[in-house]
Design a protein with these regions (language model features):
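C-terminal membrane-solvent junction of multi-pass transporters and transport-like membrane proteins
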Residues: 95-96, 101, 346-358, 390-450
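Membrane-interface "cap" regions at the ends of multi-pass membrane proteins
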Residues: 1-35, 64-69, 73-95, 253-257, ...
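Transmembrane helix-boundary motif of multi-pass solute transporters/channels
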Residues: 18-56, 205, 243-249, 259-263, ...
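Membrane-water interface regions at transmembrane-helix termini and the short interhelical loops
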Residues: 40-44, 92-108, 143-145, 158-182, ...
């Protein structure tokens, strides 16, 4: 690369291995762990789905995660700079780096709004806004929030400003320190909420529905459908393909193998997803409500459950504090990628990159907010869809799987970085080593599976 008169600031590093693991896991852990994984698992045979999910997570998620981390650690930069450092002369792999930045920005264009919903409900439960409300009234709170661009926009803006403010203090003093605190608090909240759920009358039935293998339910759902659902969940849970994880690889040292780190990140992510089910299903079975998936589970079903139980205001407050932390750790992690990219591309200091990033994300997030009210007539995916649905389709169905395929091909083919160089980087340090015998899986099987995911997402 050509030298610039104003070179980008010296690259930072994590202060500790624990910091890297918690920040990376915080990036992976998000709302999908709570509003999708438990319900899909319950509907798809409980333990049957969980077993298939773990198999696909080890076979797909861990290898692709090591590839994204390897590109970052070996290239010492964001996706664009790392590709440039590792690609052969004249190659164009670095163009995917710009697509990664676009993907991170588009993800935040709607994820900040959803994170704002979590913050809004935390405040509502904390202040007693749900106390004494009937079931219909509780359900109506969510609809009224969606109809209010002022309320949604306010919480979205607060999420954006807080996220970039944390990042402005730097990797160690801002992102790492705050995320470590939130992740530790999140784990404590999970433990408290799960123990409380175990004391409810329907805990036994709820846990059996969620965790015990039920082949009858799996066959009824369709074994093929269960396999596809498990594969999709294992693939999308880590948010691979848009460089969100790659940036943290660039902040790593080479003391530990990437497979060891990837397994630990996946374990933390799975722990939160399974724990969410341990919280949700006992509560739903105890109060005779159906655990739907998606926003209706979080903002309608569970608030009704909380308002009907003793001490519901406290448990609702703790649950939405947990959800706020789960979503906000992702926001901070992806913001860090956007900031680091701006610092490298425009050769500016971190504080200035934070201001520019915050201004851009604030403006770019407005369509998602207005898509539920003033712009509700714009339905990009057909009747009933919203701007959020359209943005999520682009990120989840296109950018994530396509980007993962690019990282995969770059790391395992002779036209990219090359399998040998990737394997050397992945196995540098102490810990679990990726065996060379997996080369056929990585070069043949994984690309086919990812292409199938892309095709399935488009039909």
């Amino acid at each position: 690369m050509n030298q610039n008169e104003n070179p980008a600031p010296k690259r930072e590093n994590f202060a500790s291995r624990l910091g890297f693991l918690l920040v990376s896991a915080g990036c992976a852990i998000g709302i999908g762990n709570v509003w999708r994984f438990p319900t899909v698992a319950g509907q798809s045979g409980g333990g049957v789905f969980v077993l298939f999910y773990l198999i696909f997570l080890l076979a797909m998620g861990v290898p692709v995660l090591t590839m994204e981390l390897a590109v970052g650690r070996a290239g010492h930069g964001t996706a664009t700079q790392a590709y440039r450092a590792l690609e052969k002369q004249g190659a164009k792999w670095h163009l995917h780096g710009y697509l990664c930045l676009f993907g991170c920005c588009m993800l935040m264009m709607y994820y900040t709004t959803v994170s704002g919903w979590m913050l809004s409900y935390f405040v509502k439960f904390l202040t007693g806004a749900f106390s004494g409300l009937s079931g219909d009234a509780v359900s109506g709170v969510f609809g009224r929030m969606l109809e209010s661009p002022g309320e949604m926009g306010g919480y979205m803006a607060l999420t954006v400003v807080l996220g970039f403010a944390i990042c402005s203090f730097g990797l160690q003093n801002g992102v790492e320190r705050i995320t470590k605190g939130m992740m530790c608090a999140l784990i404590v909240l999970i433990a408290v909420l799960a123990v409380h759920s175990f004391t409810l009358s329907g805990a036994k039935d709820g846990l059996a529905f969620f965790l015990l293998p039920d082949w009858g339910r799996a066959v009824e759902q369709g074994i093929g459908s269960v396999l596809v659902s498990a594969m999709n969940q294992a693939f999308f849970t880590l948010s691979l393909g848009i460089g969100a994880m790659e940036i943290f690889g660039s902040y790593m040292n080479r003391d530990h193998t990437l497979t060891s780190e990837a397994v630990r990140i996946c374990a933390l992510d799975t722990f939160v997803a399974v724990s969410a089910g341990l919280i949700i299903f006992p509560a739903c079975f105890s109060y005779g409500v159906s655990p739907d998936a998606g926003p209706s589970l979080i903002f309608i079903t569970l608030p009704n459950v909380f308002t009907g139980m003793a001490g519901g205001r406290v448990w609702g407050t703790l649950f939405f504090l947990f959800m706020t932390f789960a979503s906000f750790t992702t926001v901070v992690a992806v913001f860090e990628n956007i900031i680091a990219s701006a610092m490298e591309l425009f050769h500016i200091e971190r504080r200035r990159a934070c201001v520019l990033g915050a201004a851009f994300i604030l403006l770019a997030s407005v369509p998602c907010v207005l898509g539920f009210n003033l712009w509700s007539g714009f339905q990009p995916l057909g009747a009933g869809s919203t701007v959020l649905d359209g943005e999520d389709f682009i990120v989840s169905n296109l950018l994530l799987p396509f980007g993962s395929l690019v990282y995969l091909l770059f790391c395992v083919t002779k036209w990219g970085w090359g399998f040998g160089r990737y394997l050397e980087e992945a196995n540098a340090g102490e810990g679990i080593r990726l065996p060379r015998a997996l080369k056929p899986l990585l070069q043949i099987v994984l690309p086919i599976l990812i292409v199938l995911i892309i095709v399935q997402g488009l039909i």
